[in-house]
Protein backbone atom coordinates (compact mmCIF):
# COMPACT_ATOMS: atom_id res chain seq x y z
CA UNK A 1 0.00 0.00 0.00
CA UNK A 2 1.07 3.58 -0.57
CA UNK A 3 1.27 6.05 2.33
CA UNK A 4 -1.61 8.43 2.96
CA UNK A 5 -0.34 12.01 3.51
CA UNK A 6 -3.30 12.73 5.80
CA UNK A 7 -2.20 10.08 8.32
CA UNK A 8 0.50 10.10 10.97
CA UNK A 9 3.69 8.07 10.67
CA UNK A 10 2.30 5.46 13.08
CA UNK A 11 -1.01 5.23 11.22
CA UNK A 12 0.71 4.91 7.86
CA UNK A 13 3.08 2.26 9.19
CA UNK A 14 0.20 0.08 10.42
CA UNK A 15 -1.87 0.76 7.30
CA UNK A 16 0.94 -0.24 4.93
CA UNK A 17 1.93 -3.23 7.06
CA UNK A 18 -1.47 -4.92 7.03
CA UNK A 19 -3.21 -6.49 4.02
CA UNK A 20 -6.59 -5.03 5.05
CA UNK A 21 -5.07 -1.64 5.99
CA UNK A 22 -7.11 -1.65 9.21
CA UNK A 23 -6.00 -0.63 12.72
CA UNK A 24 -7.65 0.59 15.91
CA UNK A 25 -7.19 4.08 17.37
CA UNK A 26 -5.42 2.54 20.38
CA UNK A 27 -2.98 0.62 18.16
CA UNK A 28 -2.06 3.81 16.33
CA UNK A 29 -1.74 5.76 19.58
CA UNK A 30 0.50 3.15 21.22
CA UNK A 31 2.81 2.98 18.20
CA UNK A 32 2.89 6.78 18.03
CA UNK A 33 3.95 6.93 21.70
CA UNK A 34 6.62 4.28 21.06
CA UNK A 35 8.04 6.35 18.20
CA UNK A 36 7.99 9.51 20.33
CA UNK A 37 9.80 7.80 23.20
CA UNK A 38 12.50 6.46 20.86
CA UNK A 39 12.96 9.66 18.84
CA UNK A 40 15.67 11.21 21.00
CA UNK A 41 17.71 10.23 24.03
CA UNK A 42 20.59 12.68 24.39
CA UNK A 43 23.91 12.86 22.63
CA UNK A 44 25.67 10.12 24.55
CA UNK A 45 23.90 7.07 23.12
CA UNK A 46 26.05 5.24 20.60
CA UNK A 47 24.27 6.07 17.35
CA UNK A 48 23.71 9.74 18.19
CA UNK A 49 27.32 10.15 19.31
CA UNK A 50 28.31 8.50 16.03
CA UNK A 51 26.19 11.06 14.18
CA UNK A 52 27.93 13.95 15.91
CA UNK A 53 31.43 12.51 15.44
CA UNK A 54 30.90 11.84 11.74
CA UNK A 55 29.19 15.20 11.23
CA UNK A 56 32.19 16.96 12.77
CA UNK A 57 34.35 15.58 9.95
CA UNK A 58 32.40 17.69 7.46
CA UNK A 59 30.68 14.81 5.69
CA UNK A 60 27.21 14.99 4.13
CA UNK A 61 23.87 14.13 5.74
CA UNK A 62 23.48 10.80 3.92
CA UNK A 63 26.83 9.58 5.20
CA UNK A 64 26.12 10.74 8.75
CA UNK A 65 22.77 8.91 8.79
CA UNK A 66 24.36 5.79 7.28
CA UNK A 67 26.98 5.81 10.04
CA UNK A 68 24.25 6.13 12.68
CA UNK A 69 22.42 3.17 11.14
CA UNK A 70 25.62 1.11 11.27
CA UNK A 71 25.81 1.84 14.99
CA UNK A 72 22.16 1.00 15.58
CA UNK A 73 22.58 -2.30 13.75
CA UNK A 74 24.83 -3.49 16.57
CA UNK A 75 22.84 -5.75 18.93
CA UNK A 76 24.08 -3.98 22.06
CA UNK A 77 22.37 -0.81 20.87
CA UNK A 78 19.54 -1.59 18.49
CA UNK A 79 18.77 -5.19 19.40
CA UNK A 80 17.88 -4.94 23.09
CA UNK A 81 14.15 -5.55 22.67
CA UNK A 82 14.88 -8.57 20.47
CA UNK A 83 16.91 -10.09 23.29
CA UNK A 84 14.00 -9.48 25.67
CA UNK A 85 11.64 -11.28 23.29
CA UNK A 86 13.97 -14.26 22.89
CA UNK A 87 14.46 -14.42 26.66
CA UNK A 88 10.72 -14.32 27.33
CA UNK A 89 10.13 -17.16 24.88
CA UNK A 90 12.91 -19.13 26.57
CA UNK A 91 11.18 -18.61 29.93
CA UNK A 92 7.85 -19.81 28.53
CA UNK A 93 9.51 -22.87 27.00
CA UNK A 94 11.22 -23.91 30.24
CA UNK A 95 8.63 -23.24 32.95
CA UNK A 96 6.07 -25.93 33.68
CA UNK A 97 3.64 -23.44 35.22
CA UNK A 98 4.11 -19.92 33.91
CA UNK A 99 1.95 -18.53 36.74
CA UNK A 100 4.03 -20.10 39.54
CA UNK A 101 6.03 -17.30 41.18
CA UNK A 102 8.45 -19.69 42.89
CA UNK A 103 9.29 -21.45 39.62
CA UNK A 104 9.69 -18.12 37.84
CA UNK A 105 11.97 -16.78 40.58
CA UNK A 106 14.13 -19.91 40.42
CA UNK A 107 14.50 -19.53 36.66
CA UNK A 108 15.40 -15.85 36.94
CA UNK A 109 18.15 -16.88 39.35
CA UNK A 110 19.41 -19.33 36.73
CA UNK A 111 19.53 -16.48 34.23
CA UNK A 112 21.57 -14.35 36.64
CA UNK A 113 24.00 -17.19 37.31
CA UNK A 114 24.54 -17.82 33.60
CA UNK A 115 22.82 -21.20 33.75
CA UNK A 116 19.98 -20.51 31.30
CA UNK A 117 19.12 -18.87 27.96
CA UNK A 118 22.31 -17.37 26.46
CA UNK A 119 24.30 -17.88 29.69
CA UNK A 120 25.35 -14.22 29.80
CA UNK A 121 24.06 -13.76 33.35
CA UNK A 122 21.56 -11.06 32.35
CA UNK A 123 17.86 -10.42 32.67
CA UNK A 124 17.35 -8.45 29.48
CA UNK A 125 15.32 -5.26 29.69
CA UNK A 126 16.49 -4.58 33.23
CA UNK A 127 18.87 -1.73 34.06
CA UNK A 128 20.27 1.18 32.10
CA UNK A 129 23.64 2.87 31.73
CA UNK A 130 22.18 6.21 32.88
CA UNK A 131 19.00 5.50 34.86
CA UNK A 132 18.87 3.78 38.24
CA UNK A 133 15.62 4.80 39.94
CA UNK A 134 13.54 4.41 36.78
CA UNK A 135 13.60 4.84 33.02
CA UNK A 136 11.08 7.67 32.48
CA UNK A 137 10.31 6.33 29.01
CA UNK A 138 9.21 3.00 30.47
CA UNK A 139 7.10 4.74 33.11
CA UNK A 140 5.18 6.59 30.37
CA UNK A 141 5.00 3.56 28.07
CA UNK A 142 3.72 1.02 30.58
CA UNK A 143 0.23 2.48 30.82
CA UNK A 144 -0.20 2.17 27.06
CA UNK A 145 1.20 -1.36 27.13
CA UNK A 146 -1.43 -2.35 29.68
CA UNK A 147 -4.24 -0.86 27.58
CA UNK A 148 -3.08 -2.63 24.42
CA UNK A 149 -2.61 -5.97 26.19
CA UNK A 150 -6.18 -5.75 27.49
CA UNK A 151 -7.54 -4.89 24.03
CA UNK A 152 -5.62 -7.81 22.50
CA UNK A 153 -6.56 -10.34 25.19
CA UNK A 154 -2.92 -10.65 26.28
CA UNK A 155 -3.36 -9.98 30.00
CA UNK A 156 -1.76 -13.32 30.90
CA UNK A 157 1.38 -12.44 28.94
CA UNK A 158 1.41 -8.97 30.50
CA UNK A 159 1.28 -10.60 33.92
CA UNK A 160 4.51 -12.46 33.17
CA UNK A 161 6.22 -9.19 32.28
CA UNK A 162 4.97 -7.36 35.36
CA UNK A 163 5.98 -10.21 37.67
CA UNK A 164 9.50 -10.21 36.23
CA UNK A 165 9.56 -6.42 36.59
CA UNK A 166 8.66 -6.85 40.27
CA UNK A 167 11.07 -9.71 41.03
CA UNK A 168 14.14 -8.79 38.99
CA UNK A 169 15.47 -5.76 40.91
CA UNK A 170 15.47 -7.62 44.22
CA UNK A 171 17.02 -10.74 42.68
CA UNK A 172 19.74 -8.73 40.92
CA UNK A 173 20.63 -7.05 44.22
CA UNK A 174 20.57 -10.38 46.03
CA UNK A 175 22.37 -12.58 43.51
CA UNK A 176 24.66 -10.11 41.72
CA UNK A 177 25.26 -7.71 44.64
CA UNK A 178 24.24 -4.72 42.51
CA UNK A 179 22.61 -2.26 44.85
CA UNK A 180 22.70 1.00 42.83
CA UNK A 181 19.10 0.50 41.77
CA UNK A 182 17.85 -1.48 38.79
CA UNK A 183 14.59 -0.88 36.98
CA UNK A 184 13.05 -1.91 33.66
CA UNK A 185 14.05 0.11 30.61
CA UNK A 186 11.92 0.97 27.59
CA UNK A 187 13.18 -2.12 25.73
CA UNK A 188 11.56 -4.40 28.30
CA UNK A 189 8.09 -3.73 26.93
CA UNK A 190 8.68 -2.40 23.40
CA UNK A 191 9.14 -5.80 21.77
CA UNK A 192 5.96 -7.06 23.44
CA UNK A 193 4.07 -4.08 22.02
CA UNK A 194 5.44 -4.62 18.52
CA UNK A 195 4.48 -8.29 18.69
CA UNK A 196 0.92 -7.38 19.73
CA UNK A 197 0.78 -4.99 16.77
CA UNK A 198 1.79 -7.79 14.41
CA UNK A 199 5.11 -6.20 13.49
CA UNK A 200 7.72 -8.80 12.39
CA UNK A 201 10.87 -9.00 14.51
CA UNK A 202 12.95 -8.12 11.48
CA UNK A 203 11.42 -4.64 11.61
CA UNK A 204 12.03 -3.90 15.30
CA UNK A 205 15.43 -2.24 14.77
CA UNK A 206 14.41 -0.48 11.53
CA UNK A 207 11.40 0.89 13.43
CA UNK A 208 13.82 2.19 16.07
CA UNK A 209 15.67 3.97 13.25
CA UNK A 210 12.41 5.45 11.89
CA UNK A 211 11.98 7.15 15.26
CA UNK A 212 15.59 7.99 16.11
CA UNK A 213 16.35 9.65 12.76
CA UNK A 214 14.62 12.70 14.25
CA UNK A 215 17.11 12.83 17.11
CA UNK A 216 20.06 12.14 14.82
CA UNK A 217 18.97 14.99 12.56
CA UNK A 218 18.58 17.41 15.45
CA UNK A 219 22.05 16.60 16.78
CA UNK A 220 23.54 16.89 13.29
CA UNK A 221 22.00 20.33 12.85
CA UNK A 222 23.27 21.42 16.26
CA UNK A 223 26.76 20.14 15.45
CA UNK A 224 26.78 22.01 12.14
CA UNK A 225 25.58 25.26 13.70
CA UNK A 226 27.51 25.36 16.95
CA UNK A 227 30.74 23.43 16.42
CA UNK A 228 33.61 24.10 14.08
CA UNK A 229 36.09 21.44 15.14
CA UNK A 230 36.43 17.76 14.44
CA UNK A 231 35.60 15.56 17.43
CA UNK A 232 38.65 13.62 18.53
CA UNK A 233 38.25 11.90 21.92
CA UNK A 234 41.41 11.42 23.97
CA UNK A 235 42.52 7.87 24.69
CA UNK A 236 44.93 6.54 27.28
CA UNK A 237 46.81 3.29 26.71
CA UNK A 238 46.60 0.88 29.64
CA UNK A 239 48.75 -1.82 28.07
CA UNK A 240 52.02 -0.86 29.72
CA UNK A 241 55.43 -0.68 28.03
CA UNK A 242 57.37 -3.59 26.52
CA UNK A 243 60.87 -4.12 25.23
CA UNK A 244 61.30 -4.17 21.47
CA UNK A 245 61.41 -7.70 20.02
CA UNK A 246 63.19 -8.15 16.68
CA UNK A 247 60.94 -9.54 13.95
CA UNK A 248 63.08 -12.67 13.66
CA UNK A 249 62.31 -13.53 17.30
CA UNK A 250 58.58 -12.88 17.24
CA UNK A 251 56.19 -15.81 17.49
Regions found by a protein language model. Give the residues of each.
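Non-transmembrane, aqueous-exposed alpha-helical and coiled segments at domain scale
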Residues: 1-251
